[in-house]
Each structure stands twice: as C-alpha cells, then as structure tokens.
C-alpha cells in the first residue's frame, strides 16, 4: 500500500508534507487539490516531514490537502515514437495536450508520452534459445530515418533465455513481442516500451572511450579552430541577443549525427515556436526528409512552471542515452542551462540552504558536472559504438563569463565557444570570439596550421588596439599588413552566413580547401609602397574570397574566381 500524507506548509512551489509511512528521495507524489492531482518530487526528508517541489502552479493548495506517494522515481517512457514529438519537461506530448486543453495548459493533466494505438513494423533479429542481457537487441522497427532497436529493458539485471518471440509484423508498443526466462525459471514479458528513471544514467555498455573523432558541425570557426568531438561536451556562453539560439539551431541542422534532441529549458516561448515552425519545413541534407524526423524537442519555456525546468534537462539526456544504446550518434542541445541553474537557486532559497556565490546553491558545480558527465562515447555489448554529445548554452547576465554558472560549466566541458557582445554588435556571425574560445579536441585541419592562423588574429588584435591610440600613421607598414591579413581571415573564414544556402553548411573537404587558400595568403610576403595600396589589395582579395564562399564548390564560377585570386597573389608577392 502506498504511503499517504497531508500538506502542512506551502512556500511557492515548495510543499511541506507530514507523512504516515516510509518515503525515499526523489519519489514522485501527487498533491490532491480542487479535484486535481498535482505531480511533485521529494527533495528533502526530515523525520516524518518531507519537502517536495511541485511541477505545477501551487495556487489553491492548502494545509490539510491529501498527498499520495507513488513509490516510484520520476521516469520517462522509452520506446518507438519519441522522434518527431514535442514534450514538456515531464514528457507530456504537447500536441495531444493542446487537443485536450486548448491553447493554455491546465494543471494536473498528464498524458501518456507514446502513442499506444500506432502499429510499428517489427523485424526480429534474435531467435528462441538466445541468451540475452539488459540492452541486447531483440529486433527493430523503422522510426523516421532511424533503425529503432527494441531492447531488453535496462533494469533487468540477470542473463535471460528467449523462450518466445513474435514473428515479423505490425505491433503496438503494449503488445507482447517476446518472453524471456531467468535462471530460476521465472518468465518475463517484453513489450516495445519501458520506463527508466531520469536521474539514473544508463550504463548498459562494455566500456567508455575517450572522444577523438570530430563531430562536424559544418560551421568553419567551430570545425577548424574550436572543434567538438563525438561524445564530447561544449558550452556556448554569451550575452542576450548574441546568437546562441541561432548557432544551436544551425548546429542541430547540419551536425554529423543521427538524432538531435533539443531541450529548451526556460527559453522564451517565441524562440521555441520558431523552432517548431521551421524544423518540419527544413530538409535533412543526409536523407532528403524533414529534419523533424530525427529530432525530439523537450520544451519548458520561461512561462511554464520553474520546477519542471530541471526535469526537462534530465528527460532530454535520458532519451539521448536511450538512442545511444542503439549504436547511434546523438546531439543534445540544452538552451539554456542558466535558466535551469536559476530554478535550482530558487528552490535552494526556499529550502533555506546556505547560499553560495550569487545565491546559487553550494552544490551547483557538482550538479552541472553530473549532467555533462552523462555525455560520452561508448562501446556497446555487441561491439557497436554510440555517442551522446552535449552542448549547453549559458546566458550570463551582461555577458560576464566570471559568474558561477559559466565557471562551473567551464570546469567540465571540452570546448568553449564564447560569444561576445562586441562581435555580435559588429554583425560578425557566428559571434564566437576567436581570442577567448578554446577546445581540447582534435579538428579537421592540421593543428600547426590553425595555431599559425590564430597567431595572426592575436597579433592583429594587438595592432588594432595600438591603432586606436596612435592611429594608422603611428604603426609600420609591416604591422599594418599583419592587421589587414587578420581581418581577411576573420571576414572570409571565421564569419559565415547562416541564411545563405551554400555558405550555411561547409563540408570538411571545402573547409580544408578554403583554409589552404587563406593560409597561403597569410604566409605570402607582399610589398606595398603605402598603407592605402595595401588596404586596396587586401580588400580585393577579400571580395574574391567572399564571392568564392557564396559559389558552389568547384563549379565554373568558383574556379574562375580562384584563378583570378591566384593571379592577384602572384602579381604582388615578394619572391
């Protein structure tokens, strides 16, 4: 029999409950008020009193309201049908909620995440008599563009023998597809779906590997200078309006991955609506089908209850780990982890815990680290390799990278793509600062070449600061040429037009080719009689390179521009 209790105190979305029986941390409970059951989670236990955060508005909850505990952790349902869906933080399907509730969400309405009526064409890959363990494949169904493997539930701890398995055909997620037997002779029915607690990492794999293979984003500044590896982690901090969301959306469209999961936790509703409108219309360049076919969106906008923001981040990473277990490459984009941290700060304040820096909880770093640590590249039991790459945007107030959330994130990620107000105001997009950003991963271009090119950016910035004080006349022609070359590298290679059909996504082959051209210009010695002549020449090169960026790779126009560029360089270079 489930434990019962009653409300003895309410403070915002924190409810204090007096219990009659045993409870455990993170147990899910329902507060019964005004004929509705409001979902909540235990976050502190003190004697016979527990504190729970309610995932809904707590208006109307009063002292004496009854509470029922479920004896379960907060879980997600895993199975075919997750892709193309839009969920809230508690995995309620928003399109179905809209049909039931209209434009405004009602409290206490919880729907099943997966469609129980839809039939999936199951093809078995195992047979009666096979010995299986948790995470092993029984067969697969086609879900959009993905071979969705039907697995032994991850919570099964022993080895089992398959005693029954259905023939190929159409089945719903609740229909029995196999029966397995353990060593004691007990039989277990297997369906296509099962539940898993969101705060428990899925560890049904043989070993974790060190991320080494680059995950191509087709954004030049990232792939060349600040690469991200498959199974790695990266963060995108930046002030409001610097282009974090656009950069994440461009990455999700063009990244070299099988499944994209977007966790919009605490972002403005307008940006989420934009994603929901655009994604079904966009074509996946790899398959020619809608991008939505390989995407799952978990959205908890800033207008939704604060407590569910934390749940939305964990829901997203759990779904990502589930698809990783199929041997797929997953990209998870959390936008924005700052809002999630603010939700933690709010709850910590209500619990009257000792605050850390800027009133964030003292355990902020360990919570952020435990989230990013769930990324990784793993070898599965059958030898396949799957990965979850996690990218979180951070929204520090005023673009201050010294604030606690950014600093806690920097300690655990492998790449830092810092967006700056200075670059976004100058319309230099993506507004990633080439001087402040860094990456620990290997990219698509030789590191010695990229370090040489980056040295020009550093020198060019120093010379630019000098010119602000002494003017152009106060520096030598050689220094001025270094400055012009650094500006050429910035405008022709680092900057990219996300709204141009050709320049929006650049293949690794084209990146190598174009970088070699720019690298050749940086290494070539030129001689000019004055600064005006130098500026005119570099501007001519720059325009030529920009035209090449907007031309199809190696077509007639591209080759013509490249030939003209070569003649220009040969005309002015010092032999």
Swiss-Prot record:
The keyword Ion transport applies. InterPro entries: ATP-synt_VA_C, ATP-synth_a_Xtn, ATP_synth_asu-like_sf, ATPase_F1/V1/A1_a/bsu_N, ATPase_F1/V1/A1_a/bsu_N_sf, ATPase_F1/V1/A1_a/bsu_nucl-bd, ATPase_F1/V1_b/a_C, P-loop_NTPase. One of its GO terms (cellular component) is proton-transporting ATP synthase complex. ATP binds at residues 238-245. CDD domains: ATP-synt_F1_V1_A1_AB_FliI_N, ATP-synt_V_A-type_alpha_C, V_A-ATPase_A. Coiled coil: none annotated. NCBIfam families: PRK04192.1. Belongs to the ATPase alpha/beta chains family. Produces ATP from ADP in the presence of a proton gradient across the membrane. The V-type alpha chain is a catalytic subunit. This is V-type ATP synthase alpha chain. It comes from Borreliella burgdorferi (strain ZS7). The lineage of its organism: Bacteria, Pseudomonadati, Spirochaetota, Spirochaetia, Spirochaetales.
